[in-house]
C-alpha cells in the first residue's frame, strides 16, 4: 500500500513538472496569419511605383503583329494536326498577353466554360490573375477544367504580381521583392539545383523570367504545367525525359509521328550561352536601369530589344559601337535562319514521305524507328526556333541543335527510301503546292474560313460576357 501511494505521488509530481515546462499560451499570443491576397490589378501599384508602371504600360507600343506562318509556310506542315498550324504570330508586348491568347485561333471558339480544345493551363503565363487563382483554389483546383473556365477570372495582363511579392513590406518600400508566383516553376528550379530562396540577386532576376520563358508541357489528367527538367535542361536531356514517359503533344496527321512542340525555351538556351555563363541576366539586357525626368534611376519595364537602350545595356560590358554589334548579331541571325530553313525542308519531305509509306502499306513496326527519327529531328528544330532570341542568347547551341536536326532527318529519309522501295514506290514523293500559308493549310485539310468565322463569333459574343463578369466582380483594372 505504501508502495502504491509512493508511485501515485511520483506520477503526479511528473505531470506537474511537465505542465510547468509547457509554454504558456494566451489569447494575445501571435498566430500565423494567411498570406495577403494577391492583387492582380496592375494599376493599383501606379502611385507606389509610377516609373515602373508607366514603362510597363509602354509595352502596348509593341503592337505590330508578325504572322510567322505567312513568313514560313513550311511550319504549317510541320505542325499538321496541331493548333499552331492554324495561327502562329511572333510575340509582342506584355500588354497584349490577354488579348493575344483570346484572339489566337489556337484557343478555339468555346461557347461555355466546359467547352473548347485547350485546358486551363494555357492561361498560366498570361496574367497575375493566375497567381491569384492558385492562391485561392490551390494548384490542383486551378488546373481543373477547360481554358474557357478562366475567361471571366483571368483578365489582367502579365504584370506586377507575376514577378514581385506585391504585398511585402520590401515592395512597399520600393525594393524589387522578387518572387516565383508559380509553384511549378519553384519546383522546377529546385529540380536543377537552383532553389529560388538560395539564389543570388542575379539568379533570381533570371528565374522570375524563367517562370514563363521556358519549355513546359501539360502533365496528367488535369493537364498541369510541368517543366521537363528532371534530367537537365539541354535538348537531349528533355528529349530523354519525354521519351521515357512516352509523352507526345500530338500526332502529325501526315506522318503519324508522335510529336513534341517546344514552347519558348529562352531560360534553357540563355543558360548555355555566353551571357548565361557570365551571369548577365535577362534584366541586364531587356530591362536596364534608366533615369526618369528627375534623374532618379529605376528599372525600365518596357521589355524590349537591348539595342533600343544600347547605352544602358550592351556598353556595360562591350566596347564596340552599336553598328558593329548589330552587324555581329545580324550575321549570327542569318546563319541560324539559313540552317533553320534547311532543317525545315528536310522535315517537310520526311513527313510527306512517311505518309506515302503508310499509303503504300507500311506497318507500324516498320514505321516506328522512322517516326522516332522524325520526332527527334523536329524536336531539335523546334527548340531552336521557338527560342526567338537564340541567335543572341546561344548561337552556337542553336546551330548545334539545327545541325543534329538535319542529321536525324537524313536518317529518317534514308530509311524511308528503303522502305518505300520495298513497297514498290521508287520515284520521288512529290510535294503539293505549299508555297503560301493558305495553300499549306489547304494541303493539310484545314477549313480556315470556318475556323475564322467561329473565332469571330466567340470574340463578339463570349469575350464581352467574360469582361462584364470580371467588371462586376471588381477584377478589371
UniProtKB/Swiss-Prot annotation:
Known catalytic reactions: 6 Fe(III)-[cytochrome c] + NH4(+) + 2 H2O = 6 Fe(II)-[cytochrome c] + nitrite + 8 H(+)
Amino acids binding heme c 5: 275, 314, 317-318
Cofactor note: Binds 1 Ca(2+) ion per monomer.
Binding site for substrate: 216, 264
Binding site for heme c 3: 94, 209, 212-213
Any one Gene Ontology BP term: nitrate assimilation
Binding-site positions, heme c 4: 282, 285-286, 393
InterPro entries in the record: Cyt_c552, Cyt_c_NO2Rdtase_formate-dep, Multihaem_cyt_sf
Keyword Iron among UniProt keywords: yes
Pfam families assigned: Cytochrom_C552 (PF02335)
Alphabetical keyword list: Calcium, Electron transport, Heme, Iron, Metal-binding, Oxidoreductase, Periplasm, Signal, Transport
SUPFAM superfamilies per the UniProt record, alphabetical: Multiheme cytochromes (SSF48695)
Intrachain disulfide bonds: none
Enzyme class: oxidoreductase
Cofactor section: Ca(2+); heme c
Gene3D superfamilies linked: Butyryl-CoA Dehydrogenase, subunit A, domain 3, Flavocytochrome C3, Chain A
Family annotation (NCBIfam families): cyto_c552_HCOOH, PRK11125.1
Function field: Catalyzes the reduction of nitrite to ammonia, consuming six electrons in the process.
Family: Belongs to the cytochrome c-552 family.
Name of this protein: Cytochrome c-552
Source organism per UniProt: Pectobacterium carotovorum subsp. carotovorum (strain PC1)
Name of the gene encoding the protein in the UniProt record: nrfA
Amino acid at each position: 500500500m505504501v508502495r502504491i501511494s509512493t508511485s501515485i505521488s511520483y506520477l503526479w509530481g511528473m505531470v506537474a513538472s511537465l505542465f510547468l515546462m509547457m509554454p504558456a499560451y494566451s489569447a494575445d499570443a501571435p498566430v500565423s496569419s494567411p498570406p495577403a491576397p494577391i492583387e492582380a490589378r496592375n494599376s493599383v501599384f501606379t502611385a507606389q511605383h509610377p516609373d515602373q508602371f508607366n514603362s510597363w504600360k509602354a509595352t502596348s507600343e509593341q503592337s505590330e503583329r508578325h504572322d510567322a506562318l505567312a513568313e514560313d509556310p513550311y511550319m504549317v506542315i510541320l505542325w499538321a494536326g496541331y493548333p499552331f498550324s492554324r495561327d502562329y504570330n511572333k510575340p509582342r508586348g506584355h500588354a497584349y498577353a490577354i488579348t493575344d491568347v483570346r484572339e489566337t485561333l489556337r484557343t478555339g471558339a468555346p461557347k461555355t466554360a466546359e467547352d473548347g480544345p485547350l485546358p486551363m493551363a494555357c492561361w498560366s503565363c498570361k496574367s497575375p490573375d493566375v497567381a491569384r487563382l492558385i492562391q485561392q483554389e490551390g494548384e490542383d483546383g486551378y488546373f481543373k477544367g477547360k481554358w474557357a473556365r478562366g475567361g471571366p477570372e483571368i483578365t489582367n495582363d502579365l504584370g506586377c504580381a507575376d514577378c514581385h511579392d506585391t504585398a511585402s513590406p520590401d515592395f512597399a518600400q520600393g525594393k524589387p521583392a522578387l518572387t516565383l508566383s508559380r509553384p511549378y516553376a519553384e519546383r522546377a528550379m529546385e529540380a536543377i539545383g537552383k532553389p529560388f530562396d538560395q539564389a543570388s540577386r542575379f539568379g533570381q532576376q533570371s528565374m522570375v523570367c524563367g517562370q514563363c520563358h521556358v519549355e513546359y508541357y501539360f502533365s496528367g489528367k488535369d493537364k498541369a504545367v510541368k517543366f521537363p527538367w528532371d534530367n537537365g535542361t539541354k535538348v537531349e536531356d528533355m528529349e530523354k525525359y519525354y521519351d521515357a514517359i512516352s509523352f507526345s503533344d500530338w500526332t502529325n496527321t501526315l506522318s503519324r509521328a508522335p510529336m513534341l512542340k517546344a514552347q519558348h525555351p529562352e531560360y534553357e538556351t540563355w543558360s548555355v550561352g555566353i551571357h548565361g555563363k557570365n551571369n548577365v541576366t535577362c534584366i541586364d539586357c531587356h530591362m536596364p536601369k534608366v533615369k526618369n525626368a528627375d534623374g532618379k534611376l529605376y528599372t525600365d519595364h518596357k521589355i524590349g530589344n537591348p539595342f533600343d537602350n544600347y547605352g544602358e545595356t550592351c556598353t556595360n560590358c562591350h566596347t564596340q559601337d552599336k553598328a558593329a554589334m548589330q552587324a555581329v548579331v545580324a550575321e549570327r541571325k542569318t546563319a541560324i535562319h539559313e540552317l533553320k530553313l534547311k532543317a525545315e525542308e528536310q522535315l517537310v519531305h520526311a513527313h510527306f514521305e512517311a505518309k506515302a509509306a503508310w499509303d503504300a502499306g507500311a506497318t507500324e513496326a516498320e514505321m516506328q524507328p522512322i517516326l522516332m527519327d522524325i520526332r527527334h529531328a523536329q524536336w531539335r528544330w523546334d527548340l531552336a526556333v521557338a527560342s526567338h532570341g537564340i541567335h543572341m542568347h546561344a548561337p552556337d547551341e542553336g546551330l548545334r541543335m539545327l545541325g543534329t536536326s538535319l542529321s536525324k532527318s537524313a536518317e529518317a529519309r534514308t530509311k524511308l527510301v528503303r522502305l518505300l522501295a520495298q513497297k514498290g514506290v521508287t520515284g520521288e514523293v512529290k510535294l503539293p503546292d505549299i508555297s503560301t500559308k493558305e495553300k499549306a493549310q489547304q494541303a493539310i485539310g484545314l477549313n480556315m474560313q470556318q475556323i475564322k468565322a467561329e473565332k469571330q463569333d466567340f470574340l463578339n459574343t463570349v469575350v464581352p460576357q467574360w469582361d462584364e463578369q470580371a467588371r462586376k466582380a471588381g477584377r478589371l483594372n
